[in-house]
Amino acid sequence: MKIQSTIRSQARIALLACLFAAGCHAPGPVAPPADGVVLWIGEQRKAVHDGDVSAKVRLAELARRPHLYGIGPLEGLTGEITVVDGRATISTVQGSTFRTHASLDHGAAFFVWTHAADWKSVPLPNSVRTLEQLEAYLPEAARSAGLDDSAPMAFRVEGEVQSLAYHVLSPPEHTPPTFADHEKSKIRSSLAAQTVRMVGFHSTEHRGIFTPGASDVHVHFVTADERFAGHVEGFTLAPGATLLLGVPKR
């Protein structure tokens, strides 16, 4: 019964993601998506510009299926969500203090995710050390791994950063928040010489949907000790970092 319930749940979420993202319709039952396929629900631009910040999906529902990786803002734009292999790290700001805790008992205003057990390691050239350089390199990395570089892609970066700039959303001033509220609620910080795990998603076709309006990537991070997490704004990688690409099952 639990397996059947999980399958029904994943099918329902797949249908919701389809309806939100592609405007499609489903005349019959929807099968759970294959491992490694990137899905999303809600839209960044609607949350940020239109104040549509209600929960579009619950993390616990997505995590019923193993190997969940995903990122997005908390409902209400009150914090950040980073899920690494089913473990959700929630980052918030209380006063001037950054806080993190592990919990699946949250909803996301918009969310992009994959369920992936298979990841392909791709060497990072010495010339790829910053977020901008990684964004430019990802299509080439996908091709070298035999993946479709035109499809939305999940990726991870693991290793040490020499520096990393990030923000965490704090509760906005108004409900629903305005765009000005959203920008003001970004509490920025940075760290150095830390071992991190980053989860990101790349697409050339989804700016303002699950990537920011001026970028083809959306990336979050968690430090190895889980004390810090948030939305990545920039970084400089130390030598030896690893790039992993999610491999969709065919």
Language-model features: where?
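Bacterial N-terminal signal peptides that target proteins for export
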Residues: 2-14
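C-terminal motif of bacterial Sec signal peptides marking the signal peptidase cleavage site
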Residues: 21-23
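Bacterial Sec signal peptide processing site at the extreme N-terminus
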Residues: 25-37
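N-terminal low-complexity or amphipathic/hydrophobic leaders
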Residues: 51-109
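Conserved mixed alpha/beta catalytic, RNA-binding, or beta-rich assembly cores of soluble enzyme
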Residues: 94-142, 160, 175
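Mid-length scaffold segments of soluble, non-membrane domains
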Residues: 127-131, 140-187
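Short, hydrophobic/π-rich interface segment
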Residues: 172-223
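C-terminal structured interaction module
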Residues: 220-250
